[in-house]
Amino acid sequence: QFLAFYRRRPYDITNVERHPAATIIDAKPRGRGIRPRPGAFAVISIKRGGLREPHPFTISKVGPEGEVQFSIRGLGDYTRRLRDRVEVGDKMTVEGGYGRFDYAKGRKDQLWVAGGIGITPFLAFADSLTEAETRTIKLVYCVTKPEEAVGLDRLRAAERRCKGFELDLHVSKTDGRLTAEVLADKVPFDLARAGLWFCGPAPMRTALLSGLRKLGKYPASVHFEEFEFR
C-alpha cells in the first residue's frame, strides 16, 4: 500500500481526442511524473463526478518529462462514461507503471499482433525503437475498418526509422478474417524460433494460437496483455 502511494502522481489532462475507436487522453504531471517503461499500464483516477473510481489502462505513449497518453475503448459503463465526461483541464492521479509486457527482454525475431485497441502497448513499443535496433519485428495490426486504426502516423514513423520493423495493417472488412494461416503467411521469419507478443480480445488470441499449433508454427515464446478493462 505504501509503494502504491509512492507511485501515485498528480496529473493535468492536456488533450482529449474522441477518436472513432477510442478516447485518447494526454496528461502532464504536476511536478514529478511517473517513469514507466514502454508497454506498462497505470491505474488512473479522474477528479470528475463518475470518474473517480481507479481503473487500470495500458499507457500508449510516454513523454520525456513524464507525460503520458491513454487510448481507451468504450467497453463498459466506466469507459463509456469517461468518453462522455472527461475534459481538458481535469485533474487526475496516475499510479504506475506496472506489468511485465516488455519486448526488450524478448527474442531476436518478434511477431507483434494487435487486435483493435490492443494496439496501445505496441504504440509505446514502436515509439521506443531506434535506428540501432537489431531485432526483426513484424507488427500485424488487425482492425475491422480503416477508420478504427489508432496511431498509424507513429507506427509508420517507427517503420521509417527502424529498418527491422515492419507494419502490416490488416483490415478484416476487406482483407477477410485474420486466421492463423493468414498470420503465418505474413511473417518473414521462422515463427517456431520467434516470440509472439499479443494484445487484443481473448477469443482472437485463443483461435490464433490454436491454429498456429495445428500448423506446426507455434511460437517459441508467447506473451500477452489483458486490456479489457471496463
Predicted stretch roles:
Residues 4-93, 143-147, 156, 172-174:
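Ferredoxin-reductase
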Residues 1-7, 74-230:
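FNR/FR-type flavoprotein reductase catalytic core
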